[in-house]
Amino acid sequence: MAMKRKKISVIGAGFTGATTAFLLAQKELGDIVLVDIPQLENPTKGKALDMLESSPVLGFDANIVGTSDYADTADSDIVVITAGIARKPGMSRDDLVTTNQKIMKQVTKEVVKYSPNCYIIVLTNPVDAMTYTVFKESGFPKNRVIGQSGVLDTARFRTFVAQELNISVKDVTGFVLGGHGDDMVPLVRYSYAGGIPLEKLIPKDRLDAIVERTRKGGGEIVNLLGNGSAYYAPAASLAEMVEAIVKDQRRILPAIAYLEGEYGYEGIYLGVPTILGGNGIEKVIELELTEDEKAALAKSVESVKNVMRVLE
């Protein structure tokens, strides 16, 4: 039987979706289908063709097509959902909820119809609630519907730590728990630089400032751009998650997973450390938390639940 490349569909061909498609192709993780609404079909085809024409120069083998027809996504191994309206300055994440929930439901119906065995990674904000929507709408098992926020939030945290210490980001590890919003919980106790606990290297007031900047990281970029939101780091984070699944790497990565009692929460999608591999979310890793961390996580869960109430 002939070996086949993996097929990865990216729904939403805006800045994040297109950048994600380009990174996935460069990493040769599979053939890419970039999808957007019919009104944007030609620009989507144009972006895909432009990427494809870079392949001889960059030296990657991957087919990239643009389309508005979900039939072209048939039998995808992984589907990444970036579609939705973007957050504008002054707009709360909650303002996004109702519009993006409708979009998630429409997209999920089409995805499931054509790729009933795929893994779905959701980026659309507010991402905890949108991942839950896709999970419910798809009827897929929990390991196959995953939200992206922690890889990005942790990347921001690691960036700021590396800048503070003037060291390589490669030597900084960290974890961010909870919802993707102002109440996320960067776990400083479980964060290291070259194996040394950050608390031994950075004074508490500076660490607190880094934690606060991480929480506001998305908003900082929204305000600087003036129009639109971050897309390079979110796309890179999605690509890292796709790679972990496609290559069955069993990476320990923070991801938005469906909890069934872990950390004391049930029936909610929340950012937690996971093992991400060929079977999607293979395990949720439970860390021991201090009372302060538990309280911060509870506050984060409350924020997610408040957004979820808008869904109902």
Curated annotation (Swiss-Prot):
One of its GO terms (molecular function) is L-lactate dehydrogenase activity. NAD(+) binds at G12, A13, G14, F15, T16, G17, D36, N100, L123, T124, N125. It catalyses: (S)-malate + NAD(+) = oxaloacetate + NADH + H(+). One of its GO terms (biological process) is lactate metabolic process. Substrate binds at R87, R93, N125, R156. Its EC number is 1.1.1.37. The active site is at H180 (proton acceptor). CDD domains: LDH-like_MDH (cd01339). The keyword Flavoprotein does not apply. The modification Phosphoserine is found at S149. Keywords: NAD, Oxidoreductase, Phosphoprotein, Tricarboxylic acid cycle. It holds the Pfam family Ldh_1_C. NCBIfam families: MalateDH_bact, PRK06223.1. Belongs to the LDH/MDH superfamily. MDH type 3 family. Catalyzes the reversible oxidation of malate to oxaloacetate. HAMAP family: Malate_dehydrog_3. This is Malate dehydrogenase. It comes from Geobacillus thermodenitrificans (strain NG80-2). The lineage of its organism: Bacteria, Bacillati, Bacillota, Bacilli, Bacillales.
